[in-house]
C-alpha cells in the first residue's frame, strides 16, 4: 500500500522550489531557508525534509505554472549545451543538472561534466577560444571530494564545467532512482528531438 504524501514535506518542497526559481538558491540553501519560512525556529519533525527529487517535482510544477518562458528556455539551453558539447567532444562531456532534467530557472547553468585526465587541457582549449572563465571547485558527484570547475557565460547562459578524471566516467553512467543523472550529446539530442 502506498503512503499518502506528508503535507509538511510537500509544503517544504514547494517553498524550496520557489526559492530556487525566484532567488537562484542552490538546493541545500533553499532547503534551509524553506525550513525557516515554514517552521520558524521550531523543531523539524523527523522525516519531513523533502529529498532533491521531491524538490525537482515541485520546481517543475512551479515553473510550468508561473514561468511562461520555461519551455523555450529549456530548449534554448539544451541547444546551446549540444553545440558546446560538440566543441568539447575531446573531453568526453556529459550534461547533468537542471538542463539535463528539463527544469531550467533563469539562474540554472548548463552543467557539463568533462572526463579527461588533465584539467589544464580544458583551460588551454578555452583560452585558445578566447573564453573568459573563472576557476573554482565543486564536490565530486560520488565521493564529495573537491574537483576543479570552470565557470563562464555563453551569451546569457551560465556554464559550469566540472572536471573529472577519465576513470570517473565508469561510475558516472549508473542511473539513480529518477533515471540517468547525466547524458552524452547523443542522449541530449534525443531529448531535444522528443520535445520538438
PLM segments and residue spans:
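Mid-length scaffold segments of soluble, non-membrane domains
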Residues: 109, 113-115
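Catalytic core of pol beta-like nucleotidyltransferases
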Residues: 2-24, 31-106, 117-196
Amino acid at each position: 500500500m502506498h503512503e499518502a504524501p506528508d503535507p509538511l514535506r510537500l509544503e517544504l518542497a514547494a517553498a524550496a522550489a520557489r526559492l530556487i526559481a525566484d532567488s537562484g538558491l542552490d538546493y541545500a540553501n533553499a532547503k534551509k531557508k524553506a525550513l525557516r519560512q515554514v517552521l520558524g525556529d521550531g523543531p523539524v519533525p523527523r522525516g519531513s525534509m523533502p529529498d532533491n527529487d521531491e524538490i525537482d517535482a515541485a520546481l517543475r510544477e512551479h515553473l510550468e505554472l508561473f514561468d511562461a518562458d520555461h519551455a523555450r528556455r529549456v530548449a534554448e539551453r539544451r541547444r546551446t549545451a549540444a553545440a558546446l558539447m560538440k566543441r568539447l567532444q575531446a573531453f568526453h562531456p556529459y550534461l547533468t543538472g537542471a538542463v539535463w532534467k528539463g527544469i531550467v530557472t533563469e539562474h540554472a547553468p548548463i552543467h557539463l561534466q568533462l572526463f579527461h585526465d588533465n584539467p589544464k587541457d580544458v583551460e588551454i582549449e578555452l583560452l585558445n577560444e578566447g573564453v573568459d572563465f573563472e576557476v573554482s571547485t565543486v564536490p565530486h558527484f560520488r565521493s564529495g571530494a573537491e574537483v576543479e570547475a570552470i565557470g563562464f557565460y555563453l551569451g546569457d547562459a551560465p556554464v559550469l564545467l566540472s572536471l573529472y578524471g577519465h576513470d570517473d566516467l565508469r561510475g558516472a553512467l549508473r542511473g539513480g532512482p529518477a533515471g540517468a543523472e547525466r547524458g552524452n550529446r547523443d542522449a541530449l539530442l534525443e531529448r531535444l528531438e522528443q520535445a520538438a
